[in-house]
Design a protein with these regions (language model features):
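Short glycine/serine- and acidic-residue-enriched loop/turn motifs that recur at repeat junctions
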Residues: 2-36, 63-121, 153-180, 208, ...
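Conserved core positions of repeat-based scaffolds
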Residues: 20, 48-52, 61, 139-142, ...
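Beta-strand-rich domains and repeat architectures in extracellular enzymes and scaffolds
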Residues: 23-27, 37-51
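Surface loop/turn motifs at the tips and blade-to-blade linkers of beta-strand repeat domains
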Residues: 32-35, 123-125, 187-189, 257-258, ...
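Structural motif
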Residues: 58, 148, 213-222, 282-285, ...
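Loop/turn-rich, solvent-exposed surfaces of beta-rich toroidal or solenoidal domains
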Residues: 321, 378-402
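Blade-level signature of beta-propeller repeat domains, shared across WD40, Kelch, NHL, RCC1
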Residues: 418-421, 429-452, 473-476
Length: 486
């Protein structure tokens, strides 16, 4: 799932470029491909709201705002940068490909936008204090540098981390909402300093920092959760309520960590499940990622280890709504990709008639002269698709392709990895820097290739933080002439 992009080694000379493709139903693609924008921090997850900080330290939001999740205090459903002539272009096609002709960007969307506003919305928050932003379905969390957590949006299942007064709260479709960024007082009252936040569809986790270990990784001292617990996705022993409106210690997760004498390496969330990668190479799952596929599939209350991949080290993990992907480094061999979970859109990456598989299986990437000696560098899951980043600027993908988020293929579902077949204009001078996925959106981030010979082969991916000037560009495909797309 998506997240924040920042770069600890900011350079005004180096330009970072974003190329994006996919579903533009709520204006997300348009703003990412607006060439006039200079974004230095971008926040996006598997839902339909986006946030960005520009070079002037202004914080903006755009996308779906039906529950005030954009934190702008307005009740407009959609916010993104466009004008009258552009608005006519956004309602003309059944698929979403972004192309460029002359100086005009053409955007073809999945469905009609409805309400369109003239500019992205500014958020009244001191930008320098923001550490990260995490998005859920209709709500958003903000984490500040001093460890405070703020929330905004819908609160029907306790997503905001506090209770709302029914007499003063805003009501949308019968759901209590808060349109103002509000601090979660639980952490303040208990003097808990939060270092990371992660959202599922309607539940949340907050990790309390402890220190930095010898490998440079953060060791988290405490784990807290709140929100929807109908499917046991909070990792708590207590089972009094369906919904928890205040943070509670995820004691079942802590119990497992203490028993194994290990620490958290990374926590990811899907629509109704949570998944934890530990320092001792375990992958713990709880909740129920398969409920909609098999009503008899039981909820997982106490975290279970699902890592049965032997003689290897898990180096990365990512989660879509109902599937999980990991990179596994085997001793004296290359890194390999494994997937677990739902497969109704081919998101497991290998042909099978099963709609869900509760064990990890290997994904084979087609061997070609281009990738024969290349290793996988990164994986990133969208809601129902996965991107694979390799060396030499190569990208592969599999899963749902209904918005052309994997490539310009006729198939809406790709059950095995296919090469990304869009051409990036003038990419000879660019190095693929990072990949990001949102719900049905794929983003590639490039940086200018360094002139220093010693640095020319550097293609290191910084997963968590990029903080550079972002210029946004357009996409075209290898096999379809530009004028044919437009």
């Amino acid at each position: 799932m998506g997240g924040e992009l920042t770069n600890p080694n900011k350079s005004d000379k180096e330009v970072l470029s974003i190329y994006s493709v996919g579903d533009n139903s709520y204006g997300n693609i348009y703003y990412l491909n607006n060439k006039e924008l200079n974004i230095k921090r971008l926040f996006m997850d598997n839902y339909y709201q986006c946030f960005a900080i520009d070079n002037n330290n202004n914080l903006y939001s755009w996308g779906l705002n039906n529950y005030y999740q954009l934190a702008n205090g307005k009740n407009s459903k959609y916010l993104f940068n466009t004008n009258e002539s552009d608005s006519k272009k956004t309602n003309q096609s059944n698929f979403s490909i972004i192309s460029s002709s002359s100086n005009n960007t053409i955007i073809k969307t999945i469905k009609n936008i409805g309400n369109i506003f003239s500019s992205p919305s500014s958020i009244p928050m001191e930008v320098s204090k923001i550490k990260t932003i995490s998005c859920g379905d209709g709500f958003t969390l903000f984490l500040t540098n001093n460890g405070l957590v703020y929330s905004v949006g819908r609160n029907d299942k306790g997503q905001l981390g506090y209770e709302l007064n029914s007499n003063t709260a805003l009501i949308v479709d019968g759901i209590l909402c808060n349109n103002k960024l509000t601090c979660i007082e639980y952490f303040v009252k208990n003097k808990i300093n939060i270092d990371n936040i992660i959202c599922g569809a309607d539940f949340c986790f907050a990790l309390e920092s402890l220190n930095i270990d010898e490998d440079g990784d953060i060791e988290y001292n405490g784990i807290y959760s709140w929100g929807n617990n109908e499917l046991n996705q909070l990792g708590i022993e207590e089972n009094k309520y369906k919904y928890y409106f205040n943070p509670i210690k995820a004691d079942l997760v802590t119990k497992i960590l203490n028993k194994q004498r290990t620490k958290i390496k990374k926590l990811v969330c899907g629509w109704s499940h949570s998944c934890l990668l530990t320092k001792n190479n375990m992958i713990y799952l709880w909740g129920n990622p398969f409920k909609e596929y098999n009503k008899n599939y039981k909820n997982i209350k106490e975290p279970i280890n699902i890592n049965k991949i032997k003689n290897s080290k898990i180096t990365q993990i990512s989660s879509g709504f109902n599937h999980i992907a990991v990179l596994s480094k085997f001793y004296n061999s290359k890194i390999e990709l494994y997937t677990f979970g739902a497969n109704e859109f081919g998101q497991l990456g290998y042909p099978t008639e099963e709609i869900f598989i509760d064990q990890f299986n290997k994904v084979e990437i087609p061997k070609t002269e281009l990738n024969e000696n290349l290793e996988i560098k990164k994986i990133e899951c969208g809601a129902y698709h996965t991107l694979i980043q390799m060396g030499n600027n190569l990208i592969y993908g599999f899963g749902q392709n209904n918005c052309k988020q994997i490539g310009n293929y006729q198939d809406e579902f790709l059950s095995s990895p296919k090469k990304w077949n869009y051409i990036i204009d003038n990419n000879k001078d660019k190095i693929l820097y990072d990949i990001k996925c949102s719900n049905s959106i794929s983003c590639l981030l490039y940086k200018t290739r360094p002139e220093n010979k010693e640095e020319k082969n550097e293609e290191k991916i910084i997963e968590d933080k990029i903080d550079e000037k972002i210029m946004v560009n357009s996409l075209r495909t290898e096999d379809v002439p530009l004028n044919k797309i437009i």
